[in-house]
Amino acid sequence: MNPLEQLVTQAQTDFAAAIDAAALENAKAKYLGKTGQITEQMKSLGKLAPEERKAQGAVINSAKEKIEAALTARRDALSNAQMEARLNAEAIDITLPGRGRGTGGIHPVMRSWQRVEEIFGSIGFDVADGPEIENDWTNFTALNSPENHPARSMQDTFYIEGKDTQGKPLLLRTHTSPMQVRYARMNKPPIKVIAPGRTYRVDSDATHSPMFHQVEGLWIDENISFADLKGVYLNFVKAFFETDDLQVRFRPSYFPFTEPSAEIDIAFGSGPLKGRWLEVSGAGQVHPTVLRNMGFDPEQFIGFAFGSGLERLTMLRYGINDLRLFYEGDLRFLKQFN
């Protein structure tokens, strides 16, 4: 065996003995580095005659290729072994039982929404739906709010660039009453409907949010009175709070879409809120102008309407003091209701 063949055999042995990439690089330097044995052999060619240099160069190149092939093979083997070890370390025992999936829950405001629909549905009220982007006429004008009404200002209402197909300004609805207008213009009396949904106003503090939920109710017929309104709402709050031990009072107030108008307060007969009058709703007899805008003759039909904030009802039902808790997504808070 000539010296170059012995060199190849020795290189293959050294590469095979390398147990990691660092050891392999050290072995490579011994043969193929700047001062490696193959490199020194290549440098010695300059001392040979041209014909001998050509022949010896071919032999050295052949030896170099064999050494490089052995190096590549060992490098691949080490890489594969490292990958296999990592996969074995990360292996999953497929015989282990699976992890149970966490179940979600209904948001407390949505629970109140569902509860309101159940209560009013049980006494014959339909549920209306409608767009959250409304036009100026349906949100304000149809409800007897003139163009100079302060609620139309940019400080209270989120306006949207552009107009609808009829050239009316667009905005995010400030209450769910527009759904009642749309429902009434598409149906004939008797009308009994509630309109729950999201609403938007420029407001944000511990008791107000720029986005909040309302439920409004409307009853239009020929022979109803304010006494019917009182009876319906009294039965509703007793069912919602699941107690007969409460009082309800109506205070005179003003709303452009009802006349007469009232604020509705309740007082619990027991619990931490015992004896305190708490505002829960605005209500009243539908204004004649609003009835006309709905397409009804106020001389023939009469109606009453009411509206409550779902967050407000939920806060009273569960004893929550800060409205912002509903929107922070804190699971420690939300899990208490599921």
From Swiss-Prot:
One of its GO terms (biological process) is phenylalanyl-tRNA aminoacylation. It is an enzyme of class 6 (ligase). Its EC number is 6.1.1.20. It comes from Janthinobacterium sp. (strain Marseille) (Minibacterium massiliensis). Disulfide bonds: none annotated. One of its GO terms (molecular function) is magnesium ion binding. InterPro entries: aa-tRNA-synth_II (IPR006195), aa-tRNA-synth_II/BPL/LPL (IPR045864), Phe-tRNA-synth_IIc_asu (IPR004529), Phe-tRNA_ligase_II_N (IPR004188), Phe_tRNA_ligase_alpha1_bac (IPR022911), Phenylalanyl-tRNA_Synthase (IPR002319), tRNA-bd_arm (IPR010978). Belongs to the class-II aminoacyl-tRNA synthetase family. Phe-tRNA synthetase alpha subunit type 1 subfamily. This is Phenylalanine--tRNA ligase alpha subunit. Keywords: Aminoacyl-tRNA synthetase, ATP-binding, Cytoplasm, Ligase, Magnesium, Metal-binding, Nucleotide-binding, Protein biosynthesis.
